[in-house]
Amino acid sequence: MNKKIIFLIIALTVTFSNKGLSFERGVCAHFDSYSEDPVVYLKALKQIGASSIRVDYQWNKIERTKGKYVVSRPLVKTDAAINQSSLYGLNNLLILDYGNSLYDNGGYPTTRDGINAFANYTKWVVKKNKGKIKYYEVWNEWKNGTGMPPAMKNTGTAKGYFEIVKRVSHIIKENDPNAIILAGSFNPLTDSDNAWFYELIELGILDYIDGISIHPYSYKNENIQLRTAEANLNAIDQFYDKLTNIANRKTAIYITEIGIPNYDGIGGVNEIESSIFRKKYIKLASERSYIKGVWWYDLKDDGTNKSFNEHNFGIFKANMTLKKNTDENLSLKN
């Protein structure tokens, strides 16, 4: 074989291998709630050194009439961001999530009709976006009831979640074999969340996913030490060791949400402190071979009320001004 061809094959192998093994420095974003064109935010993400974006692609914004699938107005900007992200060196993590008022009264899809409908929505999304999505995360915080009607927040069971993951896993692999499937989105620093996921392991969830997604928020934790980057990740190490023993296998971990707000309430910190925490957390996480990425929550503040935590998680302020950073902590880059 020609030496040049051999060299090219080796070079391509190394390139794609590195891409597959690279540690993601991601950011959660809500493009459809932002005032500007998605390009403004994609450029900002590139500026701070992000390698991935994590976005919702809600079922109820795709299927508004039974059996008909359309990117409705509330998802237009998110869809545009997905289509343009590669121009800014960003991999897409897409969340398949939340209920639909057309099925199961808008609650968790647990009936046969609801599960079939969620599966059909998944198939449409995956076929439409084939080759554009590196990661699919099945639901967001099922156990917590995030995004669900208040009356249904505590009705999601481990068995119900398992059935959804099992069903859509086959659909994703059939229609986009290269996509990485993630599931979980729970907090491994809480006993109840861990018990819930251990039940999922017993049900066999690891046979249907490529990685476990976790949301190890700790800024409000009663154990003050766990609010530090070092202790947070040490606790995740302990969780991973127990997980590996229970499952009798090693499974990749993806931290698809972690953040700390600049607000006046419990666990809130100033902008410099959050920047230092973020820098340290990402660095320490990247040094653990079993952790494949961190997605910071989130890109920009959702509001300006300093008493409300949910308004103050952004790397940028609500007006897209970069928050205060020490020089060495300007971005997500290490």
Model-based region annotation:
Residues 1-5:
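Positively charged n-region of N-terminal signal peptides that target proteins for export
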Residues 7-15:
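Bacterial N-terminal signal peptides
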Residues 252-333:
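Substrate-binding cleft of secreted/luminal carbohydrate-active enzymes
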Residues 37-61, 84, 88-93:
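Catalytic domains of carbohydrate-active enzymes, especially glycoside hydrolases
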Residues 81-91, 128-133, 167-179, 208, ...:
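A structural motif corresponding to the C-terminal end of an alpha-helix
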Residues 20-22:
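Boundary at the C-terminal end of the N-terminal hydrophobic targeting segment
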Residues 34-36, 65-68, 73-77, 102-211, ...:
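Active-site cleft segment of glycoside hydrolase catalytic domains centered on the general acid/base Glu
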Residues 25-29, 51-55, 90-96, 134-138, ...:
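Hydrophobic faces of well-ordered beta-strands that scaffold small-molecule active sites
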